[in-house]
Structures are given as C-alpha cells and as structure tokens.
From Swiss-Prot:
Pathway: Porphyrin-containing compound metabolism; protoporphyrin-IX biosynthesis; 5-aminolevulinate from L-glutamyl-tRNA(Glu): step 2/2
Catalytic activity from the UniProt record: (S)-4-amino-5-oxopentanoate = 5-aminolevulinate
Coiled-coil regions listed in the entry: none
InterPro entries tied to this protein: 4pyrrol_synth_GluAld_NH2Trfase, Aminotrans_3, PyrdxlP-dep_Trfase, PyrdxlP-dep_Trfase_major, PyrdxlP-dep_Trfase_small
Protein name: Glutamate-1-semialdehyde 2,1-aminomutase
PANTHER family with a match to the protein in the record: GLUTAMATE-1-SEMIALDEHYDE 2,1-AMINOMUTASE, GLUTAMATE-1-SEMIALDEHYDE 2,1-AMINOMUTASE 1, CHLOROPLASTIC-RELATED
Chief subcellular location: cytoplasm
CDD domains the UniProt entry points to: OAT_like
The keyword ATP-binding is annotated on this UniProt entry: no
Family as reported in the entry's similarity comment: Belongs to the class-III pyridoxal-phosphate-dependent aminotransferase family. HemL subfamily.
Top-rank taxon: Bacteria
Subunit structure: Homodimer.
C-alpha cells in the first residue's frame, strides 16, 4: 500500500519558497532517490510520524545520535530539568565539566576535551590545533571520508599524489585546499608513498575508522596499523574522526575496536559528536594534554563558541552516556543490528540479488554488490537505480532508511525483535519486485 504524502508535498513546496532546496541539509531533500521528503511531526522510541500522521520505523535516528531511540524517559527528564534552570549562559557550568569527565573516562586516549556545537566545528578546530601543535601545514584525508563542510576538507582526490586536491564545492578557492592531500582509503602503498614524499610537512592524518558517508566501509586492521606507524615515524598526528562512530559502535568508540586487534593502539586526537549530544547540537575534540594545551586561553591556537558547552545540550548528552554505559547495552544493540543485516541479506539472496552487509554495534550498511567494498571507487559500483527502488518500496511500507546510497544506517535500543522482523518482511516483498 502506498502511503499518502499530500501534506508532506504541501510543506515541501512551502519550504522551498523560504529555504534553499526546501531543506536545511541537502540529503533531506530526497534528491538522490526522487520523491517527496517526509516532514517529521513527532517521534517516539523507534518510530516517527510524518505530516500525514503515517508511522515509520526509523533507521536513521537523526543520522546517528538517537542511540536510545526517540524520547527516552531518562533523557527527557534531564533535558526538562535543565531547561527550567536556563537555556544558555555564555559562562562555565558544572555540567560541562561532568560531561568532559565522563567522555575522558570512556575514551582514555584523551587527557582533555573541548566541547563545541557541531561535528564540522570540531573537525575544523582539530585541524587548526594539529597545525598549531606541529608547526606544519599539510593534512591527509581519504576519498569518501566526510569530516564536515570546512573548506580544507571539501576535497576530492587529485590526479596523483604530487598534485593538489580539487575543491568539491563551488566557493572553495584552490589555494585553500593546496595543503590537503587526498588518498584512497585502505590503500597502504599509496599511504606509504605520500609520507615518503611529504612526511615532514604533514601535520595530521584525519580518517574515519568506519566511513559512514560512503555507506559503511571499515578501515582494515593492517591499514589502521600502518597509519599509526607512519604518523609516529614522521611526527604527524593521527586523528580519528569518531563523530559518527563514537559511542555508536562501542562504548569506547571505534578506536576501542581497533585496540583489540592492534596492541597499545591509540589515535593522537579524536573528534566526536552525534551520540555525545543525545540529539542536541553538541560535539567535541580531544587529545593528550601536551596537544590540547596549545588551545587558547592556555596557548596560541584560537577556538571559541558562544553556545559551546550549552547547559541543555550537556544535560542531554550526559544522560545519554549514563544510559549507554549500563552493562550489556552494546551487546544487546549489536545483536539487534546483526539480526537486521542478516535478515536483509538472506531475503535478498533468496531472490538472487547481489547483496552484502556489515555492521558494528548500532551502525550498519548494505550494498547491492556481491562483496563488501573497501574504498570509494568500489562503493560507486553499487546499483543506484535498484537502491532507489528499494528505498521507495520500503518507504511505502513504513520503513525509513537513508534516502541516499552512500549513507550508513542506525539501529537504536528502542528497536524490538518485532520491528526487525517486520522490516525484513517488508524488504523481502520489495526484493521480490525489484529482482524481476
């Protein structure tokens, strides 16, 4: 049964008159998949309701933050109490100290952390700090890894290691990105060549340990190990961008997953967001004390923000971290996520469709490919036309996945076995149609 979208269409047309493209973040516009975006009216648990009061099982969760599901009672209570005390002060609070202490307790690679308001702000500030701490200018990033929309990071791979990267957005002058070196993800040979050529100039290597903006592609253990070795050898800082993976794939973030495979492994700097705010605008970056003390007011690297450490956002984040720290939380979350990906794969395979899937904790991805891709070029081989059919088929059946082939999905603690079974059943029906 196709759900009625009339009220969503009315709102979308209204929005387009006053907001560019009708949305405040491009992926929400359904441009990749076509059709009308769903305008959310309310959300609770594993579900949201659109402008037509149609219910959807939500596998986006605000693109990751809603690990407990929408409207968790403990989080709502904490936020309501904080609101009654005041929205914003522009002055320090005890709660921001408590949140920083909790983050550092759970992620021991950092001695200090600075709170900001968005992942882009955190990544941008991390690069500035890395450059200030090392006295170097160049940074390495990988094609397909997304670190927010700061100018220096909006770069795609150039035509070889010796060339500058090319801006991927209008409005970014080439000279702004001339210090950004873009490499292929999971390519150790290319990584070694880049350090051999420019190692003494590299301030930092920034990477997503699991890339959530080319769907779900994880860094191989040998690749992460070599990144660590080369950064140490050449005096560059290894930055783990855990805006998406932090507290989403494991209590200690993705770095704790790699530490199980690489003895003594730690990144030098960590970027965090999403889950640490529990759905509020909150992000952070941190490192060892020797690096963080380069930040103003102690050092000469300037960073500031009017709403940094906002008292309502920190209340939301602190309540969320306390809930996910409870024993057995991640084991249960991972089981639910695996049951989803296993069910989807079995349903697709039964219809003769190419399908591969992967997950870690409460984060997952799938591809209409026989094998899991290892880099952006391989991801691009996925069947986008068939994905669009799958997306709309699920949407019509009340299941909301990312409206783009290159985005990861998220499971929350609120998703039940019944939710997963219903989702797999819906997917099975769609697979039968699109396999013909």
């Amino acid at each position: 049964m196709t759900l009625n979208t009339d009220n969503n269409q009315i709102l979308f047309e209204r929005a387009k008159r006053v907001i560019p493209g009708g949305v405040n973040s491009p992926v929400r516009a359904f441009k990749a998949v076509g059709g009308t975006p769903r305008f959310v009216k309310r959300a609770q648990g594993a579900y949201f309701w659109d402008a037509n009061n149609q219910r959807y099982t939500d596998f986006i969760g605000s693109w990751g933050p809603m690990i407990l599901g929408h409207g968790h009672p403990a989080v709502v209570e904490a936020v309501q109490a904080a609101v009654l005390e005041g929205f914003s002060y522009g002055a320090p609070t005890e709660r921001e100290v408590e949140l920083a202490e909790e983050i550092l307790r759970l992620v021991p690679s950092m001695d200090m952390v600075r709170l900001v308001s968005s992942g882009t702000e955190a990544a941008m500030s991390t690069i500035r700090l890395a450059r200030g701490a090392t006295g170097r200018s160049k940074l390495i990033k990988f094609e397909g890894c997304y670190h927010g929309h700061a100018d220096a990071l909006l770069v795609k791979a150039g035509s070889g290691l010796a060339t500058f990267g090319n801006p991927t957005s209008a409005g970014v002058p080439p000279e702004v990105v001339q210090h950004t070196v873009v490499l292929e993800y999971n390519n150790i040979e290319q990584l070694e060549e880049a350090f051999a050529m420019q190692g003494s100039e590299i301030a930092c290597l920034m990477m997503e340990p699991i890339c959530g903006n080319m769907n779900f592609v994880r860094a191989s253990v040998p690749f992460v190990k070599r990144c660590r070795e080369l950064c140490t050898q050449y005096g560059a800082l290894l930055v783990f961008d855990e805006v998406m993976t932090g507290f989403r794939v494991a209590l200690g973030g993705a770095q704790s997953v790699y530490a199980k495979e690489i003895p003594g492994f730690e990144p030098d700097m960590t970027v965090m967001g999403k889950v640490i705010g529990g759905g509020m605008p909150l992000a952070a970056f941190g490192a060892k004390r020797a690096v963080m003390e380069h930040l103003a007011p102690l050092g000469t690297v300037y960073q500031a923000g009017t709403l940094s450490g906002n008292p309502v956002a920190t209340a939301c984040g602190l309540a969320t971290l306390r809930e996910i720290s409870k024993p057995g939380f991640y084991e249960s979350l991972a089981r639910t996520t695996r049951s989803l990906t296993d069910g989807l794969k079995a349903a697709a395979t039964a219809e003769g469709l190419a399908f591969s899937a992967d997950s870690e904790g409460g984060m997952f991805g799938f591809f209409l490919l026989d094998t899991l891709p290892q880099n952006y070029v391989q991801v691009m081989k996925s069947d986008s036309a068939r994905f669009n059919q799958l997306f709309h088929g699920l949407l019509d059946r009340g299941v909301y996945i990312a409206p783009a082939l290159y985005e990861a999905g998220f499971v929350s603690a609120a998703h039940t076995a019944e939710d997963i079974a219903a989702t797999v059943a819906a997917a099975r029906a769609v697979f039968k149609i699109i396999s013909k």
